[in-house]
């Protein structure tokens, strides 16, 4: 089974990650405010201390972030990009402008990452 990484466990991300865990998947989570991710341990989640740690251990990375700035900060960071596995998949479910999604998609595809 592929490891799933989930970044952003706020109002929408928490229940989404919880449902993935309840479906039996192995999920590693990261949130800037660690206290928002901690309760997911009760459902079997592993808490990552950094984005780099999370993506290094994940085949699929799901992001549920607040806005364009947050997505740009994560998906554009060296920590994120340099630790992704080749041929892994990034699913951004954040509320962002189409241009933001397209730009990150092009960047990730150029690195052999599915988006």
Positions of PLM-derived features:
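Rossmann-fold NAD(P) dinucleotide-binding segment
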Residues: 51-63, 67-114
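NAD(P)+-binding Rossmann beta1-loop-alpha1 motif at the extreme N-terminus of oxidoreductases
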Residues: 1-63, 83, 87-88, 93-94
């Amino acid at each position: 089974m592929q490891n799933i990484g989930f970044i952003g466990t706020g109002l929408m991300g928490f229940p989404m990650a919880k449902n993935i865990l309840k479906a039996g998947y192995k999920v590693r989570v990261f949130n800037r405010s660690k206290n928002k991710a901690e309760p997911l341990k009760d459902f079997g989640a592993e808490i990552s201390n950094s984005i780099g740690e999370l993506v290094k251990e994940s085949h699929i990375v799901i992001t549920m972030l607040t806005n364009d700035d947050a997505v740009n900060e994560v998906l554009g960071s060296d920590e994120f990009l340099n630790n992704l596995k080749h041929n892994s998949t990034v699913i951004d479910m954040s509320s962002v402008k189409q241009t933001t999604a397209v730009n990150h998609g092009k960047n990730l595809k150029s690195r052999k990452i599915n988006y």
